[in-house]
Swiss-Prot record:
Keywords: Aspartyl protease, Cell wall, Disulfide bond, Endoplasmic reticulum, Extracellular matrix, Glycoprotein, Hydrolase, Membrane, Microsome, Protease, Secreted, Signal, Vacuole, Zymogen. GO terms for cellular component: endoplasmic reticulum; extracellular region; membrane; protein storage vacuole. SUPFAM superfamilies: Acid proteases, Saposin. Pfam families: Asp (PF00026), SapB_1 (PF05184), SapB_2 (PF03489). This is Procardosin-A. The keyword Disulfide bond applies. Its EC number is 3.4.23.-. GO terms for biological process: lipid metabolic process; proteolysis. It is found in: Microsome membrane; Protein storage vacuole; Secreted, Cell wall; Secreted, Extracellular space, Extracellular matrix. Belongs to the peptidase A1 family. Glycans are attached at residues 139, 432. The active site is at residues 103, 286. The lineage of its organism: Eukaryota, Viridiplantae, Streptophyta, Embryophyta, Tracheophyta. Heterodimer of a light chain and a heavy chain. An intermediate form (35 kDa and 30 kDa subunits) is produced first, and undergoes proteolytic processing to remove the internal plant-specific insert (PSI) and the propeptide. There is some heterogeniety at the cleavage site. Interacts (via RGD or KGE motifs) with PLD1 (via C2 domain).
Length: 504
């Protein structure tokens, strides 16, 4: 899951899980795996909500893993009511079965170890037993992955990994001997299989290529949007299934070989530019993230436009009321936007950082509430106000309208871990939200970016947009499952491209 665990962000009344595994080979040579389903009770639903509120829908950028002292395969995915997609692998000989998240936001494979005796999270899941495998090779090197809300630690081992009918030999992976219970205890998967670029160990995907197991140097995801169907989705190694997309893919080059990262252009709410990414932003497609995360300044505008109710932040309103008209005057006087807040002594830097890089955890419940922390928040709110007001000035809005709009946005600020609810009866009046990728607009309808939890009168509607500001990579969007459901996604390792086409 990359650098911070991507959560089951919503809970559910019924959950569909993999069924007795059935392997089949179709006429196109692709291998498919049968699915099963299982009911989950109300307790599981509440646990899923708790995981969200603990902030697990957010990445902690900068993967902090540490090390110390000839065909194609199709993996069927299970759709956890639109909150996560996972499938089954085997480790060892004979294969020991594990359910894993196939995660394009990280590169390491880990599963619980039988030597994990003090963690409830380990005991609640399948655990790898090295003594039961004839192909196990000892390594013993310490390994750890630190997430935003917890961590796993353990040691590296080596064994065969079975995916579909492919057997990847001598694969390094972490046997987790300790897992953060608050993060992993109630998860419906055992471990994570990373599909990003190599960091501290050779990824499974690299070994597939090195061992000549796939025809093409690319893999692709199709995520089924119909949660009531048994088939949750499909991951194809070594190619793509033409039955799961329409038209041609739009490809963009990978800009940073750590995540599957690429450049995007403007983000639009309806037909209106938000302006922030018009000069260019970075994004990456992340199969291990449930929602769609982006810069607070823009996500706040989106959630305001769809009527999502978040946290009223009085400090934000204080900045707008005290400094808003001065900000407008400076913007109209053509003062460089990234210097305005330092001119007003709200920020200590002078244009050295972009807006997104200084928005760290504005409303993080764990923030230090010292005077220094408060000063940083005032700086952050000022920078966000500059972004909002600059865009409204471009729309020729009056000063009063700009101030009122900024105050409204303050009311819709939220933490990355907070559920933002909308009125389920207003979906038809909500705008589409579009991302410009490769010069083409990829739109999301309300039905695609709003997630529904529950049934009947108990149904709740949740915004699929969550705020998250990267501190190292600048303004960044994580295009998670909310985006990958409507768009079939190709990860082309051979040409270092990411491609999107309408899913079928």
């Amino acid at each position: 899951m990359g650098t911070s665990i991507k959560a089951n962000v919503l809970a559910l009344f019924l959950f569909y899980l993999l069924s007795p595994t059935v392997f089949s080979v179709s006429d196109d040579g692709l291998i498919r795996i049968g699915l099963k389903k299982r009911k989950v009770d109300r307790i599981d639903q509440l646990r899923g909500r708790r995981a969200l509120m603990e902030g697990n829908a957010r990445k902690d950028f900068g993967f902090r893993g540490t090390v110390r002292d000839s065909g194609s395969a199709v993996v069927a995915l299970t759709n956890d009511r639109d909150t996560s997609y996972f499938g089954e692998i085997g480790i060892g000989t004979p294969p020991q079965k594990f359910t894993v998240i196939f995660d394009t936001g990280s590169s390491v494979l880990w599963v619980p170890s039988s030597k994990c005796i003090n963690s409830k999270a380990c005991r609640a899941h399948s655990m790898y037993e090295s003594s039961d495998s004839s192909t196990y090779k000892e390594n013993g090197t310490f390994g750890a992955i630190i997430y935003g809300t917890g961590s796993i630690t353990g040691f590296f081992s080596q064994d065969s990994v079975t995916i579909g009918d492919l057997v990847v030999k001598e694969q390094d992976f972490i046997e987790a001997t300790d897992e953060a219970d608050n993060v992993f205890l109630h998860r419906l998967f055992d471990g994570i299989l990373g599909l990003s670029f190599q960091t501290i160990s050779v990824p499974v995907w690299y070994n597939m290529l090195n061992q000549g197991l796939v025809k093409e140097r690319r893999f692709s995801f199709w995520l089924n949007r119909n949660v009531d169907e048994e088939e949750g989705g499909e991951l194809v190694f070594g190619g793509l299934d033409p039955n799961h997309f329409r038209g041609d893919h739009t490809y963009v080059p990978v800009t940073y070989q750590y995540y599957w990262q690429f450049g995007i252009g403007d983000v639009l709410i309806g037909d209106k530019s938000t302006g922030f990414c018009a000069p260019g932003c970075q994004a990456f497609a992340d199969s291990g993230t449930s929602l769609l995360s982006g810069p607070t300044a823009i996500v706040t505008q989106i959630n305001h436009a769809i009527g999502a109710n978040g946290v009223m932040n009085q400090q934000c309103k204080t900045v707008v009321s005290r400094y808003g008209r001065d900000i407008i005057e400076m913007l109209r006087s053509k003062i460089q936007p990234d210097k305005i807040c330092s001119h007003m002594k709200l920020c200590t830097f002078d244009g050295a950082r972009d807006v997104s890089s200084i928005i760290e955890s504005v409303v993080d419940k764990n923030n230090d509430k010292s005077s220094g922390g408060i000063h940083d928040e005032m700086c952050t709110f000022c920078e966000m106000a500059v972004v909002w007001m600059q865009n409204e000035i471009k729309q020729s809005e009056t000063e009063d309208n700009i101030i009122n709009y900024a105050n409204e946005l303050c009311e819709h600020l939220s933490t990355s871990s907070e559920e933002l609810q909308v009125d389920c009866n207003t979906l038809s009046s909500m705008p589409n939200v579009s991302f410009t990728i490769g010069g083409k607009k990829f739109g999301l309808t309300p039905e695609q970016y709003i997630l529904k939890v529950g049934k009947g009168e108990a149904t709740q509607c949740i915004s699929g947009f969550t705020a998250m500001d990267a501190t190292l990579l600048g303004p960044l969007w994580i295009l998670g499952d909310v985006f990958m459901r409507p768009y079939h996604t190709v990860f082309d390792y051979g040409n270092l491209l990411v491609g999107f086409a309408e899913a079928a």
